[in-house]
């Protein structure tokens, strides 16, 4: 499983499973299988 923290929406093959925070910026945690 490969996960990314993305500022915009997840790719079509990825699932949005949570959030990442870096300072004041919130990213979406997207995982691809």
UniProtKB/Swiss-Prot annotation:
Keywords: Antibiotic, Antimicrobial, Defensin, Disulfide bond, Fungicide, Secreted. GO terms for cellular component: extracellular region. Pfam families: Defensin_1 (PF00323). It is found in: Secreted. Its main location: secreted. InterPro entries: Alpha-defensin_C, Beta/alpha-defensin_C. One of its GO terms (biological process) is killing of cells of another organism. Disulfide bonds join 3-31, 5-20, 10-30. It comes from the Eukaryota. Belongs to the alpha-defensin family. Anti-fungal and bactericidal activity, greater against Gram-positive bacteria. This is Neutrophil defensin 1.
